[in-house]
C-alpha cells in the first residue's frame, strides 16, 4: 500500500491505467470531461508497473485497471465510476476532492 500511497500524495484524482485498456480510456475521458486534471499512471509503461498492479490487487481492485482514487480514497474501477456518473454523484466527489471548482 505504501507504494500506492506515495503515488497518491497531494493529487486530487489518480487513475491507474494501461494504454491498451479501452475501459481505462473511457474513464480518463469521463473525468477529463469535467475539467479535472487527473494524474494517470500507465502501468504498462512503468518499470514497476507489475509491482503496483499486485498492490492494487491487494486493495481489492479486480480487474486492476482502471483503478481510480479521488481524494486519496479508492473509488473503484469502471463500474463504480459509471455508477457514480449515472447517479449524478461523480461531480460532487470531484468537487470535494478539489479536482474541479464548479
UniProtKB/Swiss-Prot annotation:
Gene Ontology molecular function terms on file: 2 iron, 2 sulfur cluster binding; metal ion binding
Domain of life (superkingdom): Eukaryota
Biological process annotations from GO: response to nitrate
Subcellular location: Cytoplasm
Main location: cytoplasm
Keyword set, alphabetical order: 2Fe-2S, Cytoplasm, Iron, Iron-sulfur, Metal-binding, Redox-active center
Disulfide partners: none
SUPFAM superfamilies found in the cross-reference section: Thioredoxin-like
Every Glutaredoxin domain range: 1-101
CDD domains: GRX_GRXh_1_2_like
InterPro entries: GlrX-like_pln_2, Glutaredoxin, Glutaredoxin_subgr, Thioredoxin-like_sf
Function noted in UniProt: May only reduce GSH-thiol disulfides, but not protein disulfides.
Family statement drawn from the similarity comment of this UniProt entry: Belongs to the glutaredoxin family. CC-type subfamily.
NCBIfam families, per database record: GlrX-like_plant
Protein name per UniProt: Monothiol glutaredoxin-S1
Species assigned in the record: Arabidopsis thaliana (Mouse-ear cress)
Amino acid at each position: 500500500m505504501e507504494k500506492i500511497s506515495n503515488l497518491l500524495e497531494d493529487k486530487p484524482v489518480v487513475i491507474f491505467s494501461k494504454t491498451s485498456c479501452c475501459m481505462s480510456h473511457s474513464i480518463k475521458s469521463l473525468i477529463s470531461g469535467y475539467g479535472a486534471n487527473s494524474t494517470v499512471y500507465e502501468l504498462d509503461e512503468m518499470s514497476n508497473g507489475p509491482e503496483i498492479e499486485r498492490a492494487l490487487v491487494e486493495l481489492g481492485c479486480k480487474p486492476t485497471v482502471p483503478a481510480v482514487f479521488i481524494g486519496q480514497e479508492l473509488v473503484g474501477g469502471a463500474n463504480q465510476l459509471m455508477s457514480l456518473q449515472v447517479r449524478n454523484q461523480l461531480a460532487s466527489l470531484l468537487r470535494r476532492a478539489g479536482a474541479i471548482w464548479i
